[in-house]
Amino acid sequence: MKTIYFLISLILIQSIKTLPVLEIASNSQPQDVDSVCSGTLQKTEDVHLMGFTLSGQKVADSPLEASKRWAFRTGVPPKNVEYTEGEEAKTCYNISVTDPSGKSLLLDPPSNIRDYPKCKTVHHIQGQNPHAQGIALHLWGAFFLYDRVASTTMYRGKVFTEGNIAAMIVNKTVHRMIFSRQGQGYRHMNLTSTNKYWTSSNETQRNDTGCFGILQEYNSTNNQTCPPSLKPPSLPTVTPSIHSTNTQINTAKSGTMNPSSDDEDLMISGSGSGEQGPHTTLNVVTEQKQSSTILSTPSLHPSTSQHEQNSTNPSRHAVTEHNGTDPTTQPATLLNNTNTTPTYNTLKYNLSTPSPPTRNITNNDTQRELAESEQTNAQLNTTLDPTENPTTGQDTNSTTNIIMTTSDITSKHPTNSSPDSSPTTRPPIYFRKKRSIFWKEGDIFPFLDGLINTEIDFDPIPNTETIFDESPSFNTSTNEEQHTPPNISLTFSYFPDKNGDTAYSGENENDCDAELRIWSVQEDDLAAGLSWIPFFGPGIEGLYTAGLIKNQNNLVCRLRRLANQTAKSLELLLRVTTEERTFSLINRHAIDFLLTRWGGTCKVLGPDCCIGIEDLSKNISEQIDKIRKDEQKEETGWGLGGKWWTSDWGVLTNLGILLLLSIAVLIALSCICRIFTKYIG
């Protein structure tokens, strides 16, 4: 009997060890996946493909911008996928992250992992992260690209860049919804000491010192701040049109949208939820028992120095933010005894004429509540193009608590924030026109059970318009538009040229004459016979000619109307196929996630898992443009062409020659008659 129990116990233990969940939980070594899905590395500048955002391909020229997309997470095994060698990367990284004892927190690279071969600039970063656990991965699902190997993890001492491979496209919004489930244990990079940083480009190096990680661990209880750098490092950066800092959210639901930002900051969802939603133009500070929003403020004047704009307010569990051109921070103290009164009024603001700041009202209780819930405040630095005309959003359903430092106080005190600093209030700002509605706010995908009710946002292409707007309030004013909830939006990359209308455009049914005159055979024969009659012939031919010209114009008009209807139909078909292609890739990503514990889709299906949805939208849009261009061509005149004698002057010349010949013949006949008369007489 004991032997039987012993054998049963061994069988149970063996079966438990073979469970996929336990294998993943205990696996901390790189796991090679069958590279049946290999593709070509996409261009790093190609952020958008047919309306949905690809994660990780946004080029970040500073380690600050890139570190916001990296995090630590336990329970997920790394996997590597091969890809075809791509082009030169603009920005690469070489990271070394250790704990306080000096132990490396990154995995040792396998033998087949080599440095990314072609890098324009390599950012070398060395620092500590006392809270990191597990493996370093990309929050938005992008890959760390090495030499012809794309890995889901960051390896120690290896130069990598960020990007996607063709068969592994990940949608940022769905990725955020999937990993925003309660209990997911993200461990964010939070550096608590001054870290070594330098760059290498063209065999030259610049040694500087500064902070590079600013993301806060969501459940930390320590006061973490980043000391200022004595020497501000100069980083090669590309100045964006809009730069904003991030804040921390402690609610279970987050998801305000910023349609104008491609390189989004990350906001931390509440206790127990480790996923971070994309950064927005809103600076949000929320309490656990009260939903409140910090509204965005315009940035300092462009002439203000970067040193003055980087003043932040570290508090308990503070989150510091850097400007894209200066990774150093200036510590300051939290505004004491300051809190604004709740505001329920709908306000109107114009960015060109900002309203005067509002004085805060002393409230010790509110300050203690903020300290207990570990709230932080940050300043939003936004540089707007003077040609832009953004609309202002309004929030009338939530209490607004504002803790901000005005630009005047900041410019005077770049390192210390005065307790008397007056915050400014601004409504949320949106930089996009209205977009198509596919799902309303609060809806979730049917295959995602147990997710929090998170807002869905597809980041549209900047500086483009959305065609085929299906919003119910298409003709409403700007103020009415601001009250509509955020919706899923797809901005397509095809925009056919729309030229002006012509005389016979065929855009509407009434443009063309409904009657089309078809001459009968008898009428044609009659016209041919009457043409020889001296008086009736020319008149009949003139009537027939006028009728033919009218019929020709109607035919041209109808052809144009047919071309316009065909172009519109092709646009609708292109839109449908684009949406189907987009959501097919989204569904594929969800399936990959659900099958992760069994090795992924490729492990289950084998080579059949590869999908290649060819994108022919550009070719279709070119054909649409060609149709519209051809149908709008107009030519005047008879269009006879030919030689010079068939032109207007040629006809007159021929008539003149005939007239001269006739006169010459008459003169010759006259002379001949006289000669015969003389001889006969």
Curated annotation (Swiss-Prot):
Q: Which residues face the membrane's Extracellular side?
A: 19-648
One biological-process term from Gene Ontology? virion attachment to host cell
Q: Where is the signal peptide?
A: 1-18
Composition skew (Low complexity), residue ranges: 327-347, 395-428
- Lipid-modified residues of type S-palmitoyl cysteine are 671, 673
Q: Which InterPro entries match?
A: Ebola-like_HR1-HR2, GPC_FiloV, GPC_filovir-type_extra_dom, TLV/ENV_coat_polyprotein
Q: What post-translational modification information does the record give?
A: N-glycosylated. O-glycosylated in the mucin-like region.
- Region (Disordered), start-end ranges: 223-428
Feature type site, description Cleavage:
435-436
Tell me, what's a Pfam family for it? Answer: Ebola-like_HR1-HR2
Q: What is this protein called?
A: Envelope glycoprotein
Q: What is the lineage of its organism?
A: Viruses, Riboviria, Orthornavirae, Negarnaviricota, Haploviricotina
